[in-house]
From Swiss-Prot:
Component of the global genome repair (GGR) complex which promotes global genome nucleotide excision repair (GG-NER) which removes DNA damage from nontranscribing DNA. This protein is one of 10 proteins (RAD1, 2,3,4,7,10,14, 16,23 and MMS19) involved in excision repair of DNA damaged with UV light, bulky adducts, or cross-linking agents. Component of the global genome repair (GGR) complex composed of at least ABF1, RAD7 and RAD16. Interacts with ELC1. Disruption phenotype: Mutants with mutations in the RAD7, RAD14, RAD16, and RAD23 genes show partial incision defectiveness. Keywords: DNA damage, DNA repair, Phosphoprotein. Residues 47-62 have a biased composition (Basic and acidic residues). Residues 1-200 are annotated as: Hydrophilic. It comes from Saccharomyces cerevisiae (strain ATCC 204508 / S288c). InterPro entries: Leu-rich_rpt_Cys-con_subtyp, LRR_dom_sf. This is DNA repair protein RAD7. Present with 937 molecules/cell in log phase SD medium. It comes from the Eukaryota. Transmembrane segments: none annotated. Residues 1-22, 41-68, 105-137 are annotated as: Disordered.
Length: 565
């Protein structure tokens, strides 16, 4: 039953009426009223009008100056859009307000020191002002050119485009990806396929370049059911789509029908892949041996079971990531039906998987070569015992070992697993132990001193926070120094300059030194001299690396603070 409450009577002088009543009460007590403020405003406006009469003479020059600045800025924006790699839709999003903000807004302190451009019109009252206006115009043009050059350089660095001159092949693929939407409309109007359009213009796209075209289309978010017809070729054996978010379930079925000889298929961000499409792929692709799926969250346990039954005896490589519906039961069905034929397995960010202890029981293939277990939902699900048992089964033939985000691993896995079961002359090509913050320098130094890694190509210790100089030095004293092409030492805060004195790898092309405190200009110069094929160094968070760093030709720094726009 509703019960009325005792409420204060309205109309009281000190009554609290709302969140602004206290302020209103204060203004009333101090004698501050809206009428007084209004009168003062009128007085200021009348004074401004009197001063404005003296500036009418220079108004025409002011308008021409402002118009010229706007024209230069608009030309700059148009040039930037014309030379960029975005789609037509992205280009159309550049608004008038965004273009006008380019003049007063900039992060370069040097520009503010050389020229202070006011947002208000410049008044010209004498010949000296005209000369000053000319100088300001010149400075404005230089500033705009510098901004355009910086934006282009920064965009190239972030996209890791280190080659200034693109090949004709890459230019053609870029042009296709940029104009694919327009060609699709023209093809719809003329009832012709997009592939026929490309064949008429360029003579078609070779099978070897289809994967490059797929990367370009995925980057521009232009891969859909219509552009998918470019890849419907009967002689296609391998196909990788980096972004399938716009491909419907019918598109996957069409791909399976018109490309029946596919043996390797990688579908990233395949959120629309449903039960029917997955089973259709299994039935219509009899030669399929390798399947990589990212984000197939529509597939349930029953469908996974049917799929693995169909693929029994022929599935050799299976990688899955980012789905909560791949459960322990699904993993069990995979291992029971296909475990004996698997030579490569990848499990990443699977929130419903906890029983990783099943793996050592079923991965018994003598040719097993790739194991990737990344970011388990519970850190204790992947522990030293499980990995040691796994290495006891497959360590002899392992070529790729990725254990990123398995933060429960300790030195025991390194000593009793890697060192014990990997042969002295092992075929290991990829080793990644990212975010294993319990692994120390001593265990890795012992491992590198006992096992020769003559085939190691890629190595990553990102965020292994306890690693110091001796672990890296021991790696470089190993046979790996002659084969390494990619090395990731991101966030190894314990490293000093001594570790980089020994970093001389003839085939090293990529090095990540982000957030390594000791890296400065002298280290960059030394690394460039000691590694002749090094082309890219990531230096994000290394504030000691400045624009004064001496770099040899062909070496590019990405993430340097002085290169930011």
């Amino acid at each position: 039953m509703y019960r009325s409450r005792n409420r204060p009577k309205r109309g009281g002088e000190n009554e609290v009426k709302g969140p602004n009543s206290a302020l209103t009460q204060f203004l009333r007590e101090e004698g501050i009223s809206a009428e007084n403020i209004k009168q003062k405003w009128y007085q200021r406006q009348s004074k401004k009008q009197e001063d404005a009469t003296d500036e009418k003479k220079g108004k025409a020059e002011d308008d021409s100056f402002t118009a010229e600045i706007s024209r230069v800025v608009e030309d700059e924006e148009i040039d930037e859009i014309g030379t960029g790699s975005g789609t037509e839709t992205e280009r159309a999003q550049v608004s008038y307000d965004a273009r006008m903000k380019l003049v007063p807004a900039d992060s370069d302190e040097e520009e503010y020191e050389t020229s202070h451009i006011s947002d208000t019109p410049v008044s010209l009252s004498s010949a000296n002002d005209r000369e000053s206006l000319t100088k300001k115009r010149q400075n404005t043009a230089k500033i705009i050119q510098n901004r355009r050059r910086k934006r282009k350089r920064a965009a190239d660095l972030l996209d890791r485009r280190v080659n200034k001159v693109s090949s004709l092949q890459s230019l053609c693929i870029t042009k296709i990806s940029e104009n694919i939407s327009k060609w699709q409309k023209e093809a719809d109007e003329s009832s012709k396929l997009v592939f026929n359009k490309l064949r008429d213009v360029l003579g078609g796209v070779s099978t070897a370049n289809l994967n490059n075209l797929a990367k370009a289309l995925s980057k521009n978010r232009a891969l859909n059911d219509h552009t998918l017809q470019l890849f419907l070729k009967t002689d296609l054996k391998r196909l990788t789509f980096s972004d399938c978010s716009k491909i419907s379930f019918d598109g996957y079925k069409t791909l399976a029908i018109f490309s029946p000889h596919l043996t390797e298929l990688s579908l990233q961000m395949c959120g629309q892949l449903n039960h029917e499409s997955l089973l259709y792929i299994a039935e219509k692709l009899p030669n399929l041996k390798s399947l990589n799926l990212d984000g197939p969250f529509l597939i349930n346990e029953d469908t996974w079971e049917k799929f693995f039954v169909i693929m029994k005896g022929r599935l050799e490589e299976f990688h899955i990531s980012n789905t909560h519906r791949f459960t322990d039961k699904s993993l069990s069905n995979l291992l029971i039906n296909c475990g004996s034929t698997l030579v490569s397995l990848g499990l990443s960010r699977l929130d419903s998987i906890s029983n990783y202890a099943l793996l050592p029981q079923y991965l018994v293939n003598d040719e097993f070569h790739s194991l990737c277990i990344e970011y388990p939902f519970n850190e204790e699900d992947v522990n030293d015992e499980i990995i040691i048992n796994l290495l006891g089964q497959i360590g002899r033939t392992l070529r790729k070992l990725v254990l990123n985000g398995c933060i429960d691993l300790t030195d025991s896995m390194i000593i009793n697993g890697l060192t014990a079961f990997i042969p002295e002359k092992c075929p290991l090509e990829v080793l990644s132990l990212e975010e294993s913050d319990q692994i120390t320098t001593d265990s890795l130094s012992y491992f590198f001193s006992k096992v020769e890694l003559n085939n190691l190509i890629e190595c990553s210790f990102r965020r292994c926070l306890q690693l110091g100089d001796m672990a890296i030095i021991e790696l470089l004293l190993n046979g790996a120094r002659d084969s390494l092409r990619s090395l990731n030492l991101n966030s190894l805060k314990e490293l000093t300059k001594e570790a980089f004195v020994a970093l001389a790898c003839p085939n090293l092309t990529y090095l990540d030194l982000g957030f390594v405190r000791c890296v400065d200009d002298s280290v960059i110069q030394m690394l460039g001299e000691q590694n002749p094929n090094l082309t890219v160094i990531d230096v994000f968070g290394d504030n000691l690396v400045t624009e004064k760093a001496t770099m040899r030709p062909g070496l590019t720094l990405i993430g340097r603070q002085s290169d930011s726009i």
